[in-house]
Amino acid sequence: MMKKSLLCMMTVLATALLSAANAVAQEYTLREIYQKALNTSEKMEIARENVYVAQMSKDKALSLLIPRLTAYGTYNRFTEDKYNTANIMIQPEDSAAWGVRADQTFSLSARELDALRIAGQSISKSEYDLDWAKSDFLLAVASSFYDVLKAQKALDITVANLERLTKYYHLVETRMKVGELTKTALLRAQGELSGAKSDYLKASNALKLARAALTRLTGVEPDFRLKEETVSLSEACDIQGLRKSASDLRTDLKSYDMQTKMAGQQVKYARGAFWPSVGLFAIYNRADQDPAGSTFNDENIYGGISLTFPFFEGGLRMAEFREARAKERQARLAYDDLKKSVDIEVEAACLDLDTLKGSLKFLEDQQIFARDNYNAVMKQFENGLATSLDVMDANTLLLTADKNVVDALYNYQLASLTVKKSSGTLLQFVRDGDPAVKGSSGALWQLTDVGDLRAKKSGGRLLLFFSIDES
Protein backbone atom coordinates (compact mmCIF):
# COMPACT_ATOMS: atom_id res chain seq x y z
CA MET A 1 0.00 0.00 0.00
CA MET A 2 2.82 2.36 0.96
CA LYS A 3 4.65 1.54 -2.27
CA LYS A 4 1.58 2.43 -4.35
CA SER A 5 1.13 5.70 -2.44
CA LEU A 6 4.78 6.61 -3.03
CA LEU A 7 4.42 5.78 -6.71
CA CYS A 8 1.34 7.99 -7.03
CA MET A 9 3.10 10.87 -5.27
CA MET A 10 6.07 10.60 -7.62
CA THR A 11 3.78 10.57 -10.65
CA VAL A 12 1.86 13.63 -9.42
CA LEU A 13 5.12 15.44 -8.70
CA ALA A 14 6.49 14.68 -12.16
CA THR A 15 3.24 15.86 -13.78
CA ALA A 16 3.38 19.08 -11.77
CA LEU A 17 6.96 19.68 -12.86
CA LEU A 18 5.99 19.16 -16.49
CA SER A 19 3.07 21.56 -16.24
CA ALA A 20 5.20 24.23 -14.56
CA ALA A 21 7.89 23.92 -17.21
CA ASN A 22 5.33 24.14 -20.02
CA ALA A 23 3.92 27.33 -18.51
CA VAL A 24 7.17 29.31 -18.72
CA ALA A 25 9.18 27.75 -21.56
CA GLN A 26 9.55 29.84 -24.71
CA GLU A 27 8.88 28.11 -28.01
CA TYR A 28 11.11 28.71 -31.04
CA THR A 29 11.03 27.72 -34.66
CA LEU A 30 14.28 27.48 -36.61
CA ARG A 31 13.74 30.92 -38.16
CA GLU A 32 13.10 32.48 -34.75
CA ILE A 33 16.29 30.85 -33.50
CA TYR A 34 18.09 32.35 -36.51
CA GLN A 35 16.90 35.86 -35.67
CA LYS A 36 17.76 35.62 -32.00
CA ALA A 37 21.18 34.18 -32.74
CA LEU A 38 22.06 36.91 -35.23
CA ASN A 39 21.11 39.58 -32.70
CA THR A 40 23.03 38.14 -29.75
CA SER A 41 26.06 36.37 -31.23
CA GLU A 42 29.48 37.74 -30.36
CA LYS A 43 30.83 36.37 -33.64
CA MET A 44 28.34 38.45 -35.61
CA GLU A 45 29.22 41.53 -33.59
CA ILE A 46 32.89 40.97 -34.40
CA ALA A 47 32.06 40.72 -38.12
CA ARG A 48 29.98 43.91 -37.93
CA GLU A 49 32.83 45.69 -36.20
CA ASN A 50 35.07 44.68 -39.11
CA VAL A 51 32.77 46.65 -41.41
CA TYR A 52 32.97 49.63 -39.08
CA VAL A 53 36.77 49.39 -38.98
CA ALA A 54 36.82 49.40 -42.80
CA GLN A 55 34.63 52.51 -42.80
CA MET A 56 37.04 54.22 -40.44
CA SER A 57 39.90 53.27 -42.75
CA LYS A 58 38.14 55.12 -45.55
CA ASP A 59 37.79 58.17 -43.32
CA LYS A 60 41.53 58.01 -42.65
CA ALA A 61 42.25 57.78 -46.38
CA LEU A 62 39.94 60.72 -47.04
CA SER A 63 41.74 62.80 -44.43
CA LEU A 64 44.87 62.73 -46.62
CA LEU A 65 43.00 64.78 -49.24
CA ILE A 66 42.01 67.51 -46.78
CA PRO A 67 44.49 70.24 -45.76
CA ARG A 68 45.79 70.03 -42.22
CA LEU A 69 45.24 73.12 -40.06
CA THR A 70 47.54 73.75 -37.13
CA ALA A 71 47.37 76.49 -34.50
CA TYR A 72 50.47 77.39 -32.52
CA GLY A 73 51.65 79.90 -29.94
CA THR A 74 54.84 80.66 -27.99
CA TYR A 75 55.84 83.03 -25.21
CA ASN A 76 59.45 83.94 -24.28
CA ARG A 77 60.72 85.79 -21.21
CA PHE A 78 64.28 87.12 -21.15
CA THR A 79 66.38 88.39 -18.26
CA GLU A 80 66.66 91.84 -19.80
CA ASP A 81 66.33 93.70 -23.05
CA LYS A 82 69.53 94.32 -25.01
CA TYR A 83 70.62 96.85 -27.62
CA ASN A 84 73.55 97.02 -30.02
CA THR A 85 75.96 99.90 -30.41
CA ALA A 86 73.57 101.63 -32.79
CA ASN A 87 70.91 101.58 -30.07
CA ILE A 88 68.88 99.05 -31.99
CA MET A 89 67.14 96.47 -29.78
CA ILE A 90 68.40 92.96 -30.36
CA GLN A 91 66.62 91.25 -27.44
CA PRO A 92 63.30 92.29 -25.95
CA GLU A 93 62.34 91.73 -22.35
CA ASP A 94 59.55 89.38 -23.46
CA SER A 95 58.00 88.26 -26.73
CA ALA A 96 55.07 86.18 -27.94
CA ALA A 97 54.00 84.70 -31.26
CA TRP A 98 50.90 82.82 -32.40
CA GLY A 99 49.26 81.88 -35.64
CA VAL A 100 47.54 79.35 -37.89
CA ARG A 101 49.19 77.10 -40.47
CA ALA A 102 47.62 75.08 -43.32
CA ASP A 103 49.55 72.24 -44.98
CA GLN A 104 48.70 69.93 -47.85
CA THR A 105 50.97 67.27 -49.33
CA PHE A 106 50.14 65.07 -52.29
CA SER A 107 51.87 62.92 -54.86
CA LEU A 108 51.90 63.90 -58.51
CA SER A 109 50.72 60.33 -59.23
CA ALA A 110 47.57 61.01 -57.16
CA ARG A 111 48.27 57.89 -55.10
CA GLU A 112 46.11 59.38 -52.34
CA LEU A 113 43.12 58.73 -54.60
CA ASP A 114 44.30 55.14 -55.03
CA ALA A 115 44.37 54.78 -51.23
CA LEU A 116 40.82 56.16 -51.07
CA ARG A 117 39.63 53.65 -53.68
CA ILE A 118 41.31 50.80 -51.78
CA ALA A 119 39.55 51.89 -48.59
CA GLY A 120 36.19 51.96 -50.37
CA GLN A 121 36.81 48.49 -51.79
CA SER A 122 37.77 47.33 -48.30
CA ILE A 123 34.31 48.34 -47.06
CA SER A 124 32.64 46.29 -49.80
CA LYS A 125 34.88 43.34 -48.99
CA SER A 126 34.04 43.57 -45.29
CA GLU A 127 30.33 43.63 -46.11
CA TYR A 128 30.71 40.53 -48.28
CA ASP A 129 32.67 38.87 -45.47
CA LEU A 130 29.89 39.77 -43.04
CA ASP A 131 27.26 38.15 -45.26
CA TRP A 132 29.37 35.02 -45.64
CA ALA A 133 29.98 34.92 -41.88
CA LYS A 134 26.21 35.10 -41.44
CA SER A 135 25.76 32.15 -43.80
CA ASP A 136 28.37 30.13 -41.92
CA PHE A 137 26.81 31.07 -38.61
CA LEU A 138 23.25 30.28 -39.72
CA LEU A 139 24.34 26.83 -40.88
CA ALA A 140 26.06 26.27 -37.53
CA VAL A 141 22.87 27.34 -35.75
CA ALA A 142 20.82 24.96 -37.89
CA SER A 143 23.25 22.14 -37.15
CA SER A 144 22.97 22.79 -33.41
CA PHE A 145 19.17 23.08 -33.73
CA TYR A 146 18.92 19.69 -35.43
CA ASP A 147 21.42 18.23 -32.97
CA VAL A 148 18.98 19.08 -30.18
CA LEU A 149 16.04 17.57 -32.05
CA LYS A 150 18.13 14.53 -32.91
CA ALA A 151 19.18 14.14 -29.28
CA GLN A 152 15.55 14.41 -28.16
CA LYS A 153 14.51 11.76 -30.67
CA ALA A 154 17.41 9.58 -29.56
CA LEU A 155 16.20 9.91 -25.99
CA ASP A 156 12.68 8.89 -27.02
CA ILE A 157 14.07 5.91 -28.91
CA THR A 158 16.12 4.93 -25.87
CA VAL A 159 13.05 5.17 -23.64
CA ALA A 160 11.06 3.03 -26.07
CA ASN A 161 13.88 0.48 -26.10
CA LEU A 162 13.95 0.54 -22.30
CA GLU A 163 10.21 -0.10 -22.24
CA ARG A 164 10.49 -3.03 -24.64
CA LEU A 165 13.34 -4.63 -22.69
CA THR A 166 11.51 -4.09 -19.40
CA LYS A 167 8.49 -5.87 -20.80
CA TYR A 168 10.72 -8.63 -22.11
CA TYR A 169 12.49 -8.93 -18.75
CA HIS A 170 9.22 -9.36 -16.86
CA LEU A 171 8.05 -11.91 -19.43
CA VAL A 172 11.28 -13.93 -19.12
CA GLU A 173 11.04 -13.74 -15.34
CA THR A 174 7.50 -15.10 -15.41
CA ARG A 175 8.36 -17.95 -17.78
CA MET A 176 11.43 -18.86 -15.76
CA LYS A 177 9.33 -19.21 -12.64
CA VAL A 178 7.10 -21.78 -14.37
CA GLY A 179 10.13 -23.63 -15.71
CA GLU A 180 9.81 -22.71 -19.39
CA LEU A 181 13.14 -20.82 -19.48
CA THR A 182 16.47 -21.19 -17.74
CA LYS A 183 18.36 -18.78 -15.50
CA THR A 184 20.66 -17.84 -18.37
CA ALA A 185 17.75 -16.31 -20.30
CA LEU A 186 16.91 -14.13 -17.29
CA LEU A 187 20.54 -13.09 -16.89
CA ARG A 188 20.65 -12.15 -20.59
CA ALA A 189 17.48 -10.09 -20.16
CA GLN A 190 18.93 -8.37 -17.09
CA GLY A 191 22.12 -7.59 -18.99
CA GLU A 192 20.23 -6.11 -21.93
CA LEU A 193 18.05 -4.05 -19.57
CA SER A 194 21.08 -2.69 -17.74
CA GLY A 195 22.64 -1.75 -21.07
CA ALA A 196 19.43 0.04 -22.06
CA LYS A 197 19.49 2.02 -18.83
CA SER A 198 23.08 2.98 -19.53
CA ASP A 199 22.07 4.10 -23.03
CA TYR A 200 19.24 6.12 -21.50
CA LEU A 201 21.69 7.93 -19.21
CA LYS A 202 24.00 8.67 -22.14
CA ALA A 203 21.09 9.95 -24.24
CA SER A 204 19.87 12.18 -21.39
CA ASN A 205 23.29 13.75 -20.95
CA ALA A 206 23.74 14.09 -24.71
CA LEU A 207 20.46 16.02 -24.83
CA LYS A 208 21.59 18.30 -22.01
CA LEU A 209 24.87 18.95 -23.80
CA ALA A 210 23.15 19.64 -27.14
CA ARG A 211 20.73 22.02 -25.43
CA ALA A 212 23.58 23.81 -23.65
CA ALA A 213 25.47 24.15 -26.95
CA LEU A 214 22.43 25.70 -28.64
CA THR A 215 21.94 28.08 -25.70
CA ARG A 216 25.58 29.13 -25.92
CA LEU A 217 25.43 29.62 -29.67
CA THR A 218 22.12 31.50 -29.91
CA GLY A 219 21.57 33.10 -26.51
CA VAL A 220 18.16 31.48 -25.92
CA GLU A 221 17.05 30.87 -22.37
CA PRO A 222 17.84 27.41 -20.92
CA ASP A 223 14.21 26.26 -20.63
CA PHE A 224 13.37 26.71 -24.31
CA ARG A 225 11.19 24.56 -26.53
CA LEU A 226 11.77 23.83 -30.19
CA LYS A 227 9.01 23.63 -32.75
CA GLU A 228 9.93 21.16 -35.43
CA GLU A 229 9.10 21.93 -39.05
CA THR A 230 8.22 19.44 -41.74
CA VAL A 231 10.30 19.98 -44.87
CA SER A 232 9.16 18.77 -48.27
CA LEU A 233 11.25 15.97 -49.79
CA SER A 234 10.46 17.08 -53.35
CA GLU A 235 13.41 19.47 -53.59
CA ALA A 236 15.29 18.95 -56.85
CA CYS A 237 19.04 19.40 -57.15
CA ASP A 238 20.22 20.95 -60.44
CA ILE A 239 24.01 20.99 -60.19
CA GLN A 240 24.58 23.27 -63.17
CA GLY A 241 21.97 25.76 -62.00
CA LEU A 242 23.40 25.70 -58.50
CA ARG A 243 26.91 26.30 -59.83
CA LYS A 244 25.71 29.34 -61.76
CA SER A 245 23.88 30.59 -58.68
CA ALA A 246 27.02 30.12 -56.59
CA SER A 247 29.11 32.02 -59.15
CA ASP A 248 26.64 34.92 -59.10
CA LEU A 249 25.57 35.02 -55.46
CA ARG A 250 28.22 33.58 -53.15
CA THR A 251 29.59 36.45 -51.12
CA ASP A 252 32.88 34.72 -50.37
CA LEU A 253 33.57 34.66 -54.12
CA LYS A 254 32.64 38.34 -54.30
CA SER A 255 34.96 39.02 -51.38
CA TYR A 256 37.86 37.26 -53.10
CA ASP A 257 37.10 39.10 -56.34
CA MET A 258 37.15 42.38 -54.44
CA GLN A 259 40.43 41.35 -52.84
CA THR A 260 41.85 40.87 -56.34
CA LYS A 261 40.74 44.37 -57.34
CA MET A 262 42.23 45.79 -54.17
CA ALA A 263 45.53 44.06 -54.93
CA GLY A 264 45.57 45.60 -58.41
CA GLN A 265 44.86 49.01 -56.91
CA GLN A 266 47.65 48.42 -54.41
CA VAL A 267 50.08 47.94 -57.31
CA LYS A 268 49.12 51.38 -58.63
CA TYR A 269 49.58 52.83 -55.16
CA ALA A 270 53.06 51.31 -54.86
CA ARG A 271 53.99 52.55 -58.34
CA GLY A 272 53.01 56.08 -57.30
CA ALA A 273 55.85 56.13 -54.79
CA PHE A 274 58.25 56.69 -57.72
CA TRP A 275 56.64 60.10 -58.42
CA PRO A 276 57.60 63.36 -56.69
CA SER A 277 55.53 64.78 -53.86
CA VAL A 278 54.30 68.37 -53.74
CA GLY A 279 53.77 70.26 -50.50
CA LEU A 280 51.71 73.44 -50.13
CA PHE A 281 51.54 75.59 -47.03
CA ALA A 282 49.99 78.88 -45.94
CA ILE A 283 50.73 80.65 -42.65
CA TYR A 284 49.14 83.54 -40.76
CA ASN A 285 51.41 84.78 -37.96
CA ARG A 286 50.98 87.37 -35.20
CA ALA A 287 53.75 88.54 -32.88
CA ASP A 288 54.18 90.85 -29.91
CA GLN A 289 57.17 91.99 -27.86
CA ASP A 290 58.01 94.41 -25.12
CA PRO A 291 59.58 96.73 -25.72
CA ALA A 292 58.77 96.89 -29.42
CA GLY A 293 61.62 97.83 -31.73
CA SER A 294 61.40 100.20 -34.65
CA THR A 295 61.68 97.34 -37.15
CA PHE A 296 59.27 95.00 -35.34
CA ASN A 297 56.59 93.40 -37.60
CA ASP A 298 53.58 92.22 -35.59
CA GLU A 299 51.69 90.44 -38.41
CA ASN A 300 52.55 88.53 -41.57
CA ILE A 301 50.83 86.20 -44.02
CA TYR A 302 52.76 84.03 -46.44
CA GLY A 303 52.64 80.74 -48.31
CA GLY A 304 54.92 78.41 -50.19
CA ILE A 305 55.33 75.28 -52.24
CA SER A 306 57.85 72.46 -52.03
CA LEU A 307 58.78 69.60 -54.33
CA THR A 308 60.24 66.41 -52.87
CA PHE A 309 61.75 63.62 -54.92
CA PRO A 310 63.49 60.82 -52.98
CA PHE A 311 65.72 59.47 -55.76
CA PHE A 312 67.42 56.84 -53.58
CA GLU A 313 65.98 54.89 -50.63
CA GLY A 314 68.08 51.75 -50.64
CA GLY A 315 65.67 49.89 -52.95
CA LEU A 316 62.65 50.30 -50.63
CA ARG A 317 60.21 51.53 -53.27
CA MET A 318 61.15 48.82 -55.75
CA ALA A 319 60.77 46.15 -53.06
CA GLU A 320 57.32 47.49 -52.11
CA PHE A 321 56.28 47.55 -55.77
CA ARG A 322 57.40 43.96 -56.37
CA GLU A 323 55.70 42.88 -53.16
CA ALA A 324 52.43 44.45 -54.35
CA ARG A 325 52.74 42.64 -57.70
CA ALA A 326 53.28 39.32 -55.90
CA LYS A 327 50.24 39.91 -53.67
CA GLU A 328 48.17 40.66 -56.77
CA ARG A 329 49.19 37.32 -58.27
CA GLN A 330 48.37 35.61 -54.98
CA ALA A 331 44.92 37.21 -54.92
CA ARG A 332 44.15 36.03 -58.45
CA LEU A 333 45.32 32.50 -57.68
CA ALA A 334 43.28 32.42 -54.47
CA TYR A 335 40.17 33.53 -56.38
CA ASP A 336 40.66 30.89 -59.08
CA ASP A 337 41.27 28.22 -56.43
CA LEU A 338 38.11 29.17 -54.55
CA LYS A 339 36.02 29.01 -57.74
CA LYS A 340 37.17 25.45 -58.34
CA SER A 341 36.55 24.52 -54.70
CA VAL A 342 33.05 26.01 -54.89
CA ASP A 343 32.20 23.80 -57.87
CA ILE A 344 33.22 20.70 -55.91
CA GLU A 345 31.42 21.94 -52.79
CA VAL A 346 28.18 22.45 -54.71
CA GLU A 347 28.41 19.02 -56.32
CA ALA A 348 29.22 17.33 -53.00
CA ALA A 349 26.32 19.06 -51.23
CA CYS A 350 23.95 18.15 -54.04
CA LEU A 351 25.00 14.50 -54.13
CA ASP A 352 24.76 14.28 -50.34
CA LEU A 353 21.23 15.66 -50.48
CA ASP A 354 20.21 13.20 -53.20
CA THR A 355 21.76 10.32 -51.24
CA LEU A 356 19.90 11.19 -48.06
CA LYS A 357 16.68 11.79 -49.95
CA GLY A 358 16.88 8.39 -51.63
CA SER A 359 18.00 6.46 -48.56
CA LEU A 360 15.38 8.00 -46.28
CA LYS A 361 12.55 6.14 -48.04
CA PHE A 362 14.37 2.81 -47.72
CA LEU A 363 15.20 3.48 -44.08
CA GLU A 364 11.56 4.25 -43.33
CA ASP A 365 10.59 0.96 -44.98
CA GLN A 366 13.25 -0.80 -42.92
CA GLN A 367 11.81 0.76 -39.78
CA ILE A 368 8.31 -0.50 -40.61
CA PHE A 369 9.59 -3.99 -41.37
CA ALA A 370 11.72 -4.01 -38.21
CA ARG A 371 8.75 -3.00 -36.06
CA ASP A 372 6.48 -5.62 -37.62
CA ASN A 373 9.23 -8.19 -37.23
CA TYR A 374 9.69 -7.33 -33.56
CA ASN A 375 5.96 -7.58 -32.85
CA ALA A 376 5.77 -10.94 -34.63
CA VAL A 377 8.83 -12.33 -32.83
CA MET A 378 7.47 -11.19 -29.46
CA LYS A 379 4.20 -13.00 -30.10
CA GLN A 380 6.11 -16.10 -31.09
CA PHE A 381 8.23 -15.81 -27.95
CA GLU A 382 5.16 -15.48 -25.77
CA ASN A 383 3.85 -18.70 -27.32
CA GLY A 384 7.18 -20.49 -27.02
CA LEU A 385 7.91 -20.45 -30.76
CA ALA A 386 10.93 -18.11 -30.65
CA THR A 387 14.08 -17.99 -28.55
CA SER A 388 15.58 -15.17 -26.50
CA LEU A 389 18.19 -14.70 -29.20
CA ASP A 390 15.44 -14.11 -31.76
CA VAL A 391 13.92 -11.41 -29.55
CA MET A 392 17.27 -9.69 -29.01
CA ASP A 393 18.03 -9.71 -32.74
CA ALA A 394 14.60 -8.27 -33.54
CA ASN A 395 14.95 -5.58 -30.87
CA THR A 396 18.44 -4.63 -32.05
CA LEU A 397 17.20 -4.37 -35.64
CA LEU A 398 14.31 -2.12 -34.56
CA LEU A 399 16.58 0.05 -32.41
CA THR A 400 19.05 0.48 -35.26
CA ALA A 401 16.27 1.24 -37.75
CA ASP A 402 14.77 3.90 -35.47
CA LYS A 403 18.14 5.61 -35.04
CA ASN A 404 18.92 5.45 -38.76
CA VAL A 405 15.61 7.08 -39.70
CA VAL A 406 16.11 9.92 -37.21
CA ASP A 407 19.69 10.53 -38.35
CA ALA A 408 18.73 10.48 -42.03
CA LEU A 409 15.73 12.77 -41.51
CA TYR A 410 17.60 15.54 -39.72
CA ASN A 411 20.71 15.10 -41.83
CA TYR A 412 18.52 15.59 -44.90
CA GLN A 413 17.13 18.85 -43.53
CA LEU A 414 20.63 20.05 -42.70
CA ALA A 415 21.88 18.92 -46.13
CA SER A 416 19.13 20.98 -47.75
CA LEU A 417 20.44 24.07 -45.97
CA THR A 418 24.00 23.12 -46.90
CA VAL A 419 23.01 23.10 -50.58
CA LYS A 420 21.54 26.58 -50.18
CA LYS A 421 24.69 27.81 -48.47
CA SER A 422 26.96 26.31 -51.13
CA SER A 423 24.88 27.96 -53.86
CA GLY A 424 24.85 31.33 -52.07
CA THR A 425 21.09 31.44 -51.43
CA LEU A 426 20.92 30.61 -47.72
CA LEU A 427 20.67 34.21 -46.52
CA GLN A 428 17.93 35.00 -49.04
CA PHE A 429 16.13 31.80 -48.05
CA VAL A 430 16.17 32.79 -44.38
CA ARG A 431 15.04 36.35 -45.12
CA ASP A 432 12.21 35.45 -47.47
CA GLY A 433 11.03 32.20 -45.87
CA ASP A 434 10.28 28.92 -47.58
CA PRO A 435 6.68 28.09 -48.62
CA ALA A 436 7.58 24.41 -48.57
CA VAL A 437 8.12 24.56 -44.82
CA LYS A 438 5.04 24.09 -42.68
CA GLY A 439 4.80 24.16 -38.91
CA SER A 440 4.02 20.82 -37.37
CA SER A 441 1.86 21.11 -34.27
CA GLY A 442 2.43 17.49 -33.43
CA ALA A 443 6.20 17.74 -33.35
CA LEU A 444 6.86 19.88 -30.32
CA TRP A 445 9.79 18.85 -28.19
CA GLN A 446 10.13 20.24 -24.68
CA LEU A 447 13.76 20.74 -23.73
CA THR A 448 13.89 21.47 -20.01
CA ASP A 449 15.60 19.84 -17.10
CA VAL A 450 12.63 17.48 -16.83
CA GLY A 451 12.62 16.61 -20.53
CA ASP A 452 13.29 12.95 -19.79
CA LEU A 453 10.15 12.75 -17.64
CA ARG A 454 8.10 14.49 -20.32
CA ALA A 455 9.17 11.94 -22.91
CA LYS A 456 7.88 9.16 -20.70
CA LYS A 457 4.66 10.99 -19.85
CA SER A 458 3.87 11.74 -23.50
CA GLY A 459 4.38 8.10 -24.41
CA GLY A 460 2.40 6.73 -21.50
CA ARG A 461 5.57 5.25 -20.02
CA LEU A 462 6.06 7.41 -16.94
CA LEU A 463 4.32 4.99 -14.56
CA LEU A 464 6.16 2.05 -16.09
CA PHE A 465 9.51 3.78 -15.61
CA PHE A 466 8.94 4.14 -11.87
CA SER A 467 7.68 0.57 -11.55
CA ILE A 468 10.73 -1.25 -13.00
CA ASP A 469 11.92 -3.85 -10.53
CA GLU A 470 14.94 -6.01 -11.19
CA SER A 471 15.00 -7.82 -7.85
Please place each PLM-identified region on the residue numbering.
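Transmembrane beta-barrel architecture of outer-membrane proteins
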Residues: 95-99, 143, 188, 300-302
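Residues on the lipid-exposed face of transmembrane beta-strands in outer-membrane beta-barrel proteins
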Residues: 100-104, 214, 305-309, 408
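Small/polar (Gly/Ser/Thr/Ala-rich) solvent-exposed segments
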Residues: 45, 68-92, 103-132, 254, ...
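Amphipathic alpha-helical coiled-coil segments
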Residues: 46-61, 133, 137-157, 167, ...
